[in-house]
Amino acid sequence: MNTKFASKAPKTNKVAKADAELAEVLKPGQSDELLKELHILTREGRLNQDSRRKLKQVYHLFQFIEQLLRELPEEGAGATLADHGAGKSYLGFIIYDLFFRARQGGHVYGIETRGELVERSRALAQRLGFGRMSFLNLTVAESAKASELPAQIDVVTALHACDTATDDAIAFGLAKKARCMVLVPCCQAEVAACLRET
C-alpha cells in the first residue's frame, strides 16, 4: 500500500502567532543557532518568558554599545571590546553576532574567573566560527597586565557586575585606556528597594 504523507502540516494559529512574536523580538540577522546554543531559544526555536526578559535586556544594552562602536574610527571596523565578568558570555556573543561578525576586523574578549565557563565559551565560539572572540580565565588584576589583551581596549562592558566587579571593570578600563565603558551593576534593584523603604 502506497501512502503519501504531507511534507508539512499547516501551521496552527498558535504556532503562527508564536513565530510572529519571535520575529518581532529577534533583531534582523541574529543567529538562531547562537540563541539555541545559549539556551535563549528552545530546540524548537521558541522563546520562554524568562529568556525573553534576558534577551530584551541584552538587546537594550546592545543598542547603546552598537552606537558607541559606530562612533569609533572607521565605524568600529577594528574595534576591541572586553566583557568583564563575562559569565556565560550572552552579551559578548550577541555583540559579536550582530556587530563584529559582518566586519573584517575587530575582536571581542570575554574575561571570566570561572574556568568552566571560559572553556564552554571557547568551545561555542569555535563551533559557531566566531574566530575573533577570545575567552580568558583571568582576574581583573591579571587581565589589566595580560599579554593576551591589547594595550588599549575601545569598549569595556560588565553586565550584572556583582560586589566589587563594577569597580574592577572601571579599574580595568582605566588601565586599558578604554574609550567607552558600559557597566550595569547587579545590585541596582536592591539599592532602589532600600531607597523606597527610607
Per-range role (PLM):
Residues 76-87:
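Conserved class I S-adenosyl-L-methionine
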Residues 78, 105, 153:
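Phosphate-coordination loops involved in phosphoryl transfer and adenosine-cofactor binding
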Residues 53-60, 87-91, 113-117:
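Phosphate/oxyanion-binding active-site loops and adjacent basic polyanion-contact surfaces
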Residues 57-77:
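Conserved alpha-helix/loop element of class I SAM-dependent methyltransferases that forms part
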Residues 1-36, 44, 51, 63, ...:
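Class I S-adenosyl-L-methionine
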Residues 88-103:
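Conserved SAM-binding loop of SAM-dependent methyltransferases across substrates and taxa
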Residues 107-112:
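Conserved SAM-binding motif I beta-strand of class I
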